[in-house]
Every structure is written in C-alpha cells, then in structure tokens.
Amino acid sequence: MNFKFSYLALFLFLISCEETAHNLQDENLSLSIDTVSFEIIQGTTYQVPPIMGGSKFLYLGQNDGYLFDYNYIRVSKFSNSQYYISSDNIISQFHDYNDSTITIDSVRLSLNFVDDSISANSLFYLRYFPNVSDSVFSRNNTNYLNLNTNYSDIIDYGKIEIDTTSSKLIFSIDPSHFNSFIDTSNLNFNNVFAVGIKNAEFDYYKFYSANNGQSTVSKLSVYFKHTVNDTLIIDTLNTHNIIDDLTILTPPDLVDLDTTSLSVSLAKGLKSLITVDTKLWNIPDGSVFRKAELIFNTINQDSSDSDIINSYLLTDLQYPNVFTRFDEEDFTYDITNGSSAVINNNALKFNHRSALEKALSNKKSLHTFNIQPNVDVDPFKTIRFHNVKSSQFYPKLRITYVLP
C-alpha cells in the first residue's frame, strides 16, 4: 500500500467536500469525513455612526445624501529632515523652533487633491484646537455624533494651486497660531487642524489620506530665517507630514433594502448579525475540525471579487432581532478568532473553525456572528446579502470534521 498516495488522495477529496454531507471510509486509513449543516435562526442589520479611519481618501462637501462635514488632520511634530543650527542645537521637532536665532516667517498647510484639475465654487476654511489637551480625534472611534468641536474660529480660507501634475489646497497659517504647536510648556500638544467647507450644495471634493502612502501625503511647511551671525541670514524651510486623518461624515437616509436584507456599508455604518443554534450537537470525541463555514449569498450581482468582508463571533448575550440604530458600537468581538473572506461568484464563505471550536468546547449552543466590510472596501458601496427568510439563498453554517 502506498500511504503517501493515499493521504494525498484524501487531502484532495477533503477540498472537494463542500456542498453536501459526505462520509468517506478507508480500511487502511480508518478515517471518515462528515459535514453537518445548521440553519440561521435569526439575522438582522444594525447601524452605527460611520467611521472612515481606514480610507485612503478624505472627502469634503456632499454627494448622494452623504454630508462630509470636516477633515480632522494631525501633523507630525517631527520634521522630515533635521536642520542644523549649531553644534548643540538642531531643529527636528516643533519645540525646536523656539531658538533665539530662528524667526518663523510663515506656515503653510497643503492637502493633495486626487483630481489633477479642480474647479471649485466652494470655500474651504481652516480651524485648529488651541484649548484641547487630549488628542482631539481617534480614527477608530471619532464620528459625527461624538466629534470634538472645541475648535478655534476660522484662521484661514484656502486657495487652490494647480500645476501640470497635481492640484493642492493651500492654507496660510499666521505664526501667532502656530505658537500653540511649538510651545515648550506643552510638548504633547494635539497638533490637529480641522478643514471644513462652505457653499458645497452640489459638490464634493476628494483628497489623498495619509493612509494612501508617502508619495501623496499632505504636508505642513514651516518657512523660517536662521540668523547665523550679523552678516549671514539663511532663509529655509522644514516640512512635517500629515500622519493621521479622518473624514467626519453624516450618512444619508437608508432605503428599505438596507434594513430588510443583511447589509454592510462603511459610509452608512451598516453591519449585520446572524445567530446559529447548534442545539445539543458537539463534535464527536476524537474528531478534528476541518472547517466551519458561515455562508452568505449576495443580492448585489455587481459585487466585486475584491470586496473583503470581516466576521467575528460575538461574546455578548443580548442582540436585537430587528433593525436597530446605536450611537456607538454595542458589541464585543472575539477579535483573535475573526475570519475574513472575499466575495466570489456572489457567495461569501467564512471559516470560523477556531471560534466555533472554542465555543462548542464551552458547551454553548447559540452563536452570534457579526459581518462588516473591511476598511479598504469602497466606503460608498452597500453590499447586501439574502436574509434568513430567503427560501433558497438563506445563510447557513456548515461544519466539516474528520473522525478517526
């Protein structure tokens, strides 16, 4: 008997066993493979305030009911290059500008538009946060319901600069406002600006986020004079990259399909829950989990194969059974045992082997899973899946295991 060949054949057979229950026995291997399916007993969509912290772009204005209220932007206190002042002094971060030989002439904040050519009737404006001691915003938590509005009055209106390769939105910052950033008595200043827009009834504008990479990152430029001696004054500049940013958006009104199907959307803040009842079933003694597939079927026929969706087993006990809005995320995920999947041929299959193996070992029969879009999915796409009432495409859980 060629055991290497037999084990290879078994492995290939395991891969093919997906759609229905199978039982394979081999006198020499003494192994069998079983698949058991469970129906979803409950499913619903819920909404939380949208958070765009993972997006590669920033938005201002409004479009299709979305209101892009503000961009919150954090500047690095460290300069991109060090400027040598003397043997004992260099400029490498904000507070280093406080030197008797340094005079700040002007400060400019530039944001990079995605489009090369911009024609704007809107008015962009800039604020900052001189009286806020904390970090102002978090890309994972800040939204239109909890944003910090303790900002200054408008300190500048932006100008658009266009050259042959790019378009930029430029703000000029008076050095008096920049003093908060370089104050040596507050080395942990928030370093945050808020960029807003007026007269944007029909327009929205798209900028590169710091998440998009170094080649398109926006910058703060500090122009200053260095007085070396009575006869030598050097005019130069330092740049500081934007290291963190976030679009604050208000979502549009939902349509019926958003709430009657199992829907996920970044910009609408839509996520979905499903609950599986495995009743008294447990994996037979000595068996090994091969996979535990949670399967959904999309309603959207144009869903891209690149759409990545994440799923987590929830550890809470109470869940809504109808569409519900929350002011903040109300559930606790088992993050370490999460699963991600790509939509393929209108089907989405998560392997929740680790999460379910753990839950079943704890004698749990009800298992509730969350599904939500990955941070790099098109934020304005709503992906909808058939719910538990579908006669043919309802979601299901299918566990495959190997029994010696």
Which residue ranges define each predicted feature?
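Secreted, disulfide-rich extracellular signaling modules
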Residues: 2-7, 17-404
